[in-house]
Structure formats: structure tokens, C-alpha cells
């Protein structure tokens, strides 16, 4: 049986803003996939490790270069999708974390679409957006 991909928003940085669903999926999944930029900073990992014991999980780092080169980005997205599909083919459920919400300018949306197009199951899981968190911090509404 194939696994399923979950593209999970982890909020704007405060680990207390992870949704209950995000925490549950991170605890239950077989693999945690995380975007990795061109340096050693891994903000998403730093956030989730404060809430979930991720060292016990299989981790997959997906390189997402910071570039305007569309070809390079498309290759990175396809490579990420291919790596996740290998996990899904082995029956593993994968959570691909993204800062904020996957429905608002998120890295994982491209991988999500490629995985769906390849015939696999993938679900978007909303997270708290930065603009909503800022409004709350300012004690105002949008």
C-alpha cells in the first residue's frame, strides 16, 4: 500500500502556534521532509523539534535553492517530488513541513502538485500565517 504526503504548515515561528493537526501528523508520520536552502539554517526543523521528538524520525532534506532561475527551481521541485515518491512507494507517510501555511506562497505547493500529478495522494494542512500572527501580536484585526 502506498503512503500519503501531507504538506503541513507549521506557522510563523512560534512553536505554540502549530496546530493540533500538525503536531499529530508529525508524531504519526514515518518521514519528515524539510526544505533546505543554500546555507545551514533550517528554520522549520528548529521550530518543530521544540514540539515533536524528530530525532526518532526518518528525515528527508529537500534542497530548495534561493534563485530566480525557473529551470533550477523546477529541477529542485521535481527532485523533491521524486524523493518523496520513493518513500510513498515504500508505504511510508511523509510530512513535508513549510513555514506559515502551504496555501500562501509556500515551497511545498510545487512538490504537492507534482506528487498529485504522478497519481499519489497528497493533502494540504493549513498553518497559521505570518500576517494573521502579526495582527494578533499587535492586538488588532485585519
Task: Please annotate each region the language model reported.
Residues 1-64:
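Glycine-rich, flexible N-terminal cofactor/catalytic loop recognition
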Residues 100-142:
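Class I SAM-dependent methyltransferase SAM-binding "motif I" and its flanking Rossmann-like core
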Residues 1, 25-28, 82-92:
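Glycine-rich phosphate/diphosphate-binding loops that line cofactor/substrate pockets in enzymes
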Residues 39-41, 67, 129-132:
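Short gly/pro/ser/thr-enriched loop/turn and capping motifs at secondary-structure boundaries
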Residues 79-84, 92-108, 112:
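N-terminal glycine-rich phosphate/adenylate-binding segment common to multiple enzyme folds
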Residues 13, 73-85:
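Glycine-rich, highly charged phosphate/nucleotide-binding loops
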Residues 34, 61, 96-98, 124-127:
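General beta-strand structural signal in soluble alpha/beta enzymes
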Residues 50-52, 78, 139-142:
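Short, hinge-like loop/turn segments at secondary-structure boundaries
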Amino acid at each position: 500500500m502506498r503512503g500519503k504526503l501531507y504538506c503541513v504548515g507549521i506557522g510563523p515561528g512560534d512553536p505554540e502556534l502549530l496546530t493540533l493537526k500538525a503536531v499529530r501528523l508529525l508524531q504519526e508520520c514515518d518521514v519528515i521532509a524539510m526544505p533546505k536552502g543554500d546555507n545551514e539554517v533550517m528554520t522549520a526543523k528548529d521550530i518543530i523539534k521544540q514540539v515533536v521528538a524528530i530525532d526518532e524520525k526518518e528525515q528527508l532534506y529537500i534542497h530548495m535553492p534561493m534563485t530566480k532561475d525557473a529551470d533550477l527551481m523546477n529541477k529542485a521541485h521535481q527532485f523533491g517530488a521524486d524523493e518523496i515518491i520513493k518513500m510513498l512507494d515504500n508505504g511510508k507517510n511523509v510530512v513535508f513541513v513549510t513555514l506559515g501555511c502551504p496555501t500562501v506562497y509556500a515551497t511545498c505547493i510545487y512538490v504537492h502538485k507534482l506528487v498529485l500529478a504522478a497519481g499519489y495522494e497528497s493533502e494540504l494542512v493549513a498553518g497559521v500565517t505570518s500576517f494573521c500572527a502579526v495582527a494578533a501580536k499587535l492586538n488588532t484585526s485585519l
